[in-house]
A protein has these predicted regions:
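Compositionally biased low-complexity segments enriched in polar/charged residues
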Residues: 1-8, 12-45
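Extracellular/luminal recognition modules and glycoprotein regions
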Residues: 45-106
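Extracytoplasmic/secreted envelope proteins and their assembly/folding machinery
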Residues: 63-66, 70, 109, 113, ...
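Beta-sheet entry/capping signal
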Residues: 68, 198-202, 528, 536-538
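Pocket-edge structural micro-motifs
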Residues: 73, 205, 542
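Secretory-pathway/luminal and periplasmic proteins that interact with or process carbohydrate-rich
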Residues: 77-80, 276-285, 454-465, 575
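Noncatalytic, helix-rich "gating/capping" subdomain that lines the substrate-entry/channel surface
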Residues: 105-425, 461, 473-474, 478-479, ...
């Protein structure tokens, strides 16, 4: 490349250099000088013109680094996005944020619906007939079936109370994956952190309807506040959310039971507060987030593991299980033993089922939408029924959807390109670690070892579980969801009893967040990316391999690095972050850093946070 010739008042720039730079400079030089023509040899600009460009404000004058750092830095990008998506009005979109991820996910969602509708026009085999039945059930108003399930719920509850069978009730709830996230005893199956090829039962914390759990103590704190505090915006907002939550519970009661007071809103609210109090217990020393408990020791923590496991479906009770908190387990089990049959707790037990049943009933869905999506998340419009049905379809037919989506949209050229890019970026990452000045020799050695073994999985997860052909109904979504959940629970139990290999039942590719009602597993048709420390793997789903995240047409390596390159480096960096560094190169729970390494890492991270907070 030739040298740029510089004179006191004039700068000469080669045409090819100008072409490279003009995409970076906000306004091309030619607009400032008002020249009519750009010659092939040079483009003449004065120093004064360059100074004008540098001094020109690139944001609204009211936006400064001190009052709005994010918008100051990203002003042009945000402006371009608004222009790009201006055709999507608030009345048309059903998602909260307008960005490349949501726009692309909406595109993929519609492609999935199209795939389903094309198949069910003329189903050719049993699976396609089952797909048709389930899809129809998820978009059909089934009030008669809903009331049948509601009646059955009361019969089931009364039976457990009559038999004084707390552990049977808890087992019954935990068989239902859609409901158990609200249960005080929350069971799941997870990888054994000390042996990635084994699974273990985990007893953990529940989740709550309100994301900000401090709101459950609102009525305890309110009397202690001054008038000045009550006039603050934060107090008024908290009060609004709490009242809307109580109204939401009351609306469900009124819609389902009329004037009968079956579910008392304050009873549900107070039970959840009692559960939160149990989380604050601190009587047991040496507690951790990964406790192993032998079945003969479970009674020490007021937990009847043997009875609970049998209620789940175990024929032979496992000898050991994992617990997120011994303090919580001990306190919440005592709370349950003393109170589970009281009227207050009956409101809670009915509520946790009705909450989920209403979401999958078209006649009732507006009630949970108003609180969970509109008020808490700001979603402007209900999700279209066919798009919402994809949650249930992904749950019950993930293998089918994955197969059909891959057949239609797999791009081998993109897959190979991303793999090669990943390999090159790993080399750069290893070079950075090699040149690192603050890691200990131990930390540096383990980091390089981990990067040598990190893998990339592109497109679709390996060993996706085939969809069972169960006896689904075409007019009862709740029945179908529960039927599949029971089947899945049985398979998870088989993982623990060594009847099947973990590789045969990889449920990682079909996880649903039932609290948020969104796909959070590694489905190939979600627009996201992942790093999993237990297998030391980066995963890029097929749905991510499309515009704007990757395109190989005339936009250059800079564009590719900004999108898919940035995604790959972001995910691979998780292998060495605060959480990823807890696992070795083979995915086993083992620190790869020394204590000094971790202290230095934390200090650097905090310094970066402070730097941003200074300007924010």
């Amino acid at each position: 490349m030739g040298k740029t010739k510089k004179i006191k008042k004039i700068i000469y720039v080669k045409k090819e250099d100008y072409d490279k730079c003009k995409s970076i400079v906000h306004s091309p030089y030619i607009h400032i000088e008002k020249e009519k023509k750009v010659t092939n040899k040079t483009i003449k600009k004065t120093n004064d013109s360059i100074i004008k460009i540098i001094n020109r404000p690139f944001t609204n004058k009211n936006i400064t680094p001190n009052n709005d750092f994010y918008n100051y830095i990203n002003f042009d990008t945000i402006k371009e996005l608004k222009e790009k998506y201006k055709h999507i009005s608030n009345n048309e979109k059903y998602y909260v944020q307008v960005d490349d991820f949501r726009i692309t996910q909406d595109k993929v969602n519609n492609e999935l619906v199209e795939i389903i509708e094309n198949i069910i026009k003329s189903p050719q085999n049993k699976k396609e007939h089952m797909v048709k039945k389930v899809f129809h059930s998820l978009i059909t108003d089934s009030r008669k079936e809903f009331h049948f399930h509601l009646k059955n719920l009361f019969v089931t509850y009364d039976t457990y109370v009559k038999n004084d069978d707390l552990w049977g009730l808890l087992g019954y709830i935990n068989k239902n994956e859609i409901v158990r996230w609200l249960c005080p005893i929350n069971w799941s199956v997870t990888r054994n952190l000390t042996n990635k090829n084994k699974y273990i039962n985990l007893i953990g914390f529940p989740s709550f309807t309100l994301y900000n759990t401090s709101l459950y103590f609102f009525f305890d704190i309110e009397p202690t506040l001054t008038m000045k505090q009550k006039n603050e915006k934060s107090y008024k907002y908290d009060k609004y959310i709490v009242n809307e939550y109580l109204k939401y519970i009351q609306k469900m009661n009124d819609r389902c039971f009329g004037s009968n007071k079956v579910i008392i809103p304050m009873d549900v609210f107070n039970v959840q507060k009692e559960i939160l109090y149990s989380m604050a217990c601190n009587n047991i020393k040496n507690d951790s987030d990964n406790n192993l408990v032998k079945k003969e020791d479970a009674n020490k923590y007021n937990f009847e593991w043997d009875l609970f496991a049998k209620a789940l479906g175990y024929k032979i009770v496992p000898d050991v299980f994992s617990v997120e908190s011994l303090n919580y387990l001990s306190c919440v089990c005592k709370l349950l033993k003393d109170n589970w049959k009281t009227p207050k707790w009956k409101s809670f037990w009915i509520y946790i089922f009705l909450k989920e049943m209403s979401i999958f009933n078209i006649h009732l869905r507006d009630i949970p939408f108003d609180l969970n999506r509109k008020i808490l998340l700001g979603q402007p419009k209900k999700t279209p029924p066919k798009i919402f049905a994809l949650i249930g379809m992904s749950y019950m037919f993930n293998y089918f959807l994955s197969k059909e989506y891959v057949e239609k949209y797999y791009n081998e050229y993109y897959v190979n390109y991303v793999q090669n890019l990943f390999d090159d970026l790993i080399k750069i990452f290893k070079r950075i670690i090699t040149n690192n000045k603050w890691l200990s020799p131990f930390g540096k050695k383990n980091s390089l070892l981990k990067l040598n073994h990190i893998t990339l999985n592109i497109g679709i997860q390996k060993n996706v579980v085939n969809d069972p052909l169960l006896d689904y109904k075409d007019n009862d979504a709740w029945y179908n969801l529960c039927l599949f959940s029971e089947w899945k629970t049985e398979k998870l139990i088989e993982l623990l009893t060594n009847k099947v290999s973990p590789i045969d039942y990889n449920f990682d590719s079909s996880i649903i967040d039932w609290r948020a009602n969104k796909l959070t597993g590694k489905q190939c048709y979600i627009v996201n990316s992942f790093y999993t420390p237990t297998v030391n793997e980066v995963y890029i789903p097929l749905a991510y391999l499309q515009k704007p995240f990757i395109t190989l047409h005339n936009l250059g390596i800079e564009y590719i690095m900004a999108y898919i390159g940035g995604t790959l480096t972001h995910e691979m960096s998780h292998s060495l972050d605060a959480n990823g560094s807890k696992f070795n190169y083979n995915g086993v729970l083992e620190d790869i850093f020394t204590e000094k390494d971790k202290t230095t890492y934390t200090k650097i991270a905090n310094d970066i946070i402070s730097q941003y907070e200074t300007f924010a």
